[in-house]
């Protein structure tokens, strides 16, 4: 059951614009930067960030797609034959010696990010890995923090954050729901 909308379309747009500026500022431009979205919604957020960065800097940033299914420590079985549902990774550029900016919708326990870092390291040795998230809800189980955060939304363990994006859900909003 939905309790509250914490970000509407305008708030998401503003947060992504701010994150784009922060990425440019922290990296002193975008030379050597690549964006890698964590499937599913992280991909769309990475694409939106790339658009904003291009508008600001006038240069495009490569965007890749990362499927971390086989890297998770809590491998969930999502098909009838109990095999993991693998969606495929598409990172059409080298990550070695690049500043890889992982992009995801929600930072919670840190386990997804840990799995994403393992997946990136299997592709090469980046100069640096940074993390951009739309929402940080706390409750970390691993020592991971985001470099770029759209909004901090403290939650209880009985709540979940639901991110809806137009590309997937037909609407842009972030809301808190009861489990």
UniProtKB/Swiss-Prot annotation:
A motif (PRPP-binding) lies at residues 100-112. The keyword RNA-binding applies. InterPro entries: PRibTrfase_dom, PRTase-like, PyrR, PyrR_bifunctional. Pfam families: Pribosyltran. Its EC number is 2.4.2.9. Keywords: Glycosyltransferase, RNA-binding, Transcription, Transcription regulation, Transcription termination, Transferase. GO terms for molecular function: RNA binding; uracil phosphoribosyltransferase activity. One of its GO terms (biological process) is DNA-templated transcription termination. It catalyses: UMP + diphosphate = 5-phospho-alpha-D-ribose 1-diphosphate + uracil. NCBIfam families: PRK05205.1-1 (NF003545), PRK05205.1-3 (NF003547), PRK05205.1-4 (NF003548), PRK05205.1-5 (NF003549). Homodimer and homohexamer; in equilibrium. Belongs to the purine/pyrimidine phosphoribosyltransferase family. PyrR subfamily. Regulates transcriptional attenuation of the pyrimidine nucleotide (pyr) operon by binding in a uridine-dependent manner to specific sites on pyr mRNA. This disrupts an antiterminator hairpin in the RNA and favors formation of a downstream transcription terminator, leading to a reduced expression of downstream genes. This is Bifunctional protein PyrR.
């Amino acid at each position: 059951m939905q309790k509250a909308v914490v970000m509407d379309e305008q708030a998401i747009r503003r947060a992504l614009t701010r994150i784009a500026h922060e990425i440019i500022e922290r990296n002193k431009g975008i030379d050597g930067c690549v964006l890698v979205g964590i499937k599913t919604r992280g991909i769309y957020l990475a694409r939106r960030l790339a658009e904003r960065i291009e508008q600001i800097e006038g240069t495009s940033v490569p965007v890749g797609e990362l499927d971390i299914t086989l890297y998770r420590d809590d491998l969930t079985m999502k098909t009838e034959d109990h095999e993991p549902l693998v969606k495929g990774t598409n990172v059409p550029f080298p990550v070695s010696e690049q500043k890889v900016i992982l992009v995801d919708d929600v930072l919670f326990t840190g386990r997804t990010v840990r799995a994403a870092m393992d997946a990136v390291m299997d592709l090469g040795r980046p100069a640096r890995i940074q993390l951009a998230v739309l929402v940080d809800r706390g409750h970390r189980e691993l020592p991971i923090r985001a470099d770029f955060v759209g909004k901090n939304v403290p939650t209880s363990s009985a709540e979940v954050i639901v991110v809806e994006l137009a590309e997937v859900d037909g609407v842009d909003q972030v809301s808190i729901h009861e489990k």
